[in-house]
Amino acid sequence: MNQYFLLHTYFQVSRLIGLCNLHYDSSNHRFILNHVPTVVYCVILNVVYLLVLPFALFVLTGNIYHCPDAGMFGVVYNVVALTKLLTMLFLMSSVWIQRRRLYKLGNDLMKMLHKFRFNLGNDCRNRCLCKGLLTSSRFVLLTQQLLTRDSVVNCESNSSLRQAMVPYQSAAIVYALIMILLMSYVDMTVYMVEVAGNWLLVNMTQGVREMVQDLEVLPERNGIPREMGLMQILAAWRKLWRRCRRLDALLKQFVDIFQWQVLFNLLTTYIFSIAVLFRLWIYLEFDKNFHLWKGILYAIIFLTHHVEIVMQFSIFEINRCKWLGLLEDVGNLWDINYSGRQCIKSSGTILSRKLEFSLLYMNRKLQLNPKRVRRLHIVGLFDLSNLTVHNMTRSIITNVLVLCQIAYKKYG
């Protein structure tokens, strides 16, 4: 019952922070759209978020021009920390407009999971828990950016004004952390859906392997026993292939719903990572109050944050590998089934034609250059794969090196 408890808690928190009005009914294994008063509560909370946003940004950045001790690097570092807050406008509008679509897709996914007995296993659960643990680095980084001694929030230009602003600044920091939680929920939801999809693909691949084993024990000579066995395998394959097509459509629709949020999250994370790595270099190179343990701690926090982003990409790469594994096993099934001596209207011939169509479909889906055959995953700009995250990492390092050279020329 652990998975039911975790799902129930997950959606309870999402309702508490006003992200959606979905409720998971563990007794019926489906999602329910809670209406009044849940909708009223969520709408009021979202309106409050929108109204508070400009005031929170002003409170957290209003001291930029009044901090004599804050250098340019420190100011930029603090302002970049707040860029993620601007994406919440896209997040909330998209989730609320498409909440009925999410409700339908979520129930379709739960049906597929329960058809395979909904036993996700330790690997899937551990992946989601590890992703959640790594996501906490976002909150640590934001808190560190807003509360360190050289932050704009802690500017000491006017001590009396600072004391008067402390309650408002504390409230603004809590607001910023809630906004990070909202955006983290989107990334986590996409990740959980992909993990569940990968688990379903593993079970479907196992089903194909069982068909291969059944086909191998059938008599080689054409006759009634072989024909009856082929009819059963053909019926099982049709059912399995419908589930494969449905799963492919579900995963694509989930990504389509959240693609703009994922795009803006990745864009702000890209800028965020450059600022964090550059700030780490500034601290190691120029800080007069340098402490080795602080440098190591900052490095660990940055690496944790970056690994969390890599996990977001790698789950899509794992999904591709699972489809490739399914493709290979379907090819093996076709090889064993194919025989030139079969009658045109036999179940074996029909199964071969069905398998050939499936092989063409998956080969087209899994081409190395997806631009030729389909839209890329995220707004038609790039694919979520290990290649993309490696390019992103190289770009981050390159930009930091360029900034370091500029800093040396200007301040070195």
Swiss-Prot record:
Q: Does the keyword Metal-binding apply?
A: no
Q: What does the entry list under GO cellular component?
A: axon; dendrite; membrane; neuronal cell body; plasma membrane
Question: Which keywords belong to this entry?
Answer: Cell membrane, Glycoprotein, Membrane, Receptor, Transducer, Transmembrane, Transmembrane helix
Question: What does the record list as GO biological process?
Answer: monoatomic ion transmembrane transport; sensory perception of taste; signal transduction
Q: What is the lineage of its organism?
A: Eukaryota, Metazoa, Ecdysozoa, Arthropoda, Hexapoda
- What family is this protein classified in? Belongs to the insect chemoreceptor superfamily. Gustatory receptor (GR) family. Gr10a subfamily.
The gene behind this protein is: Gr58c
Q: Where are the transmembrane segments?
A: 39-59, 72-92, 173-193, 224-241, 262-282, 296-316
Q: What name has this protein been given in UniProt?
A: Putative gustatory receptor 58c
Give the record's membrane topology: Multi-pass membrane protein
Gene Ontology molecular function, alphabetical:
ligand-gated monoatomic ion channel activity; taste receptor activity
Function of the protein: Probable gustatory receptor which mediates acceptance or avoidance behavior, depending on its substrates.
Q: Where in the cell is it found?
A: Cell membrane
Q: What is its main location?
A: membrane
Give the matching InterPro entries.
7TM_chemorcpt
Which cysteine residues pair off into disulfide bonds? Answer: none
Q: Which of this chain's residues carry glycans?
A: N158, N203, N337, N386, N391
Cross-referenced Pfam families: 7tm_7
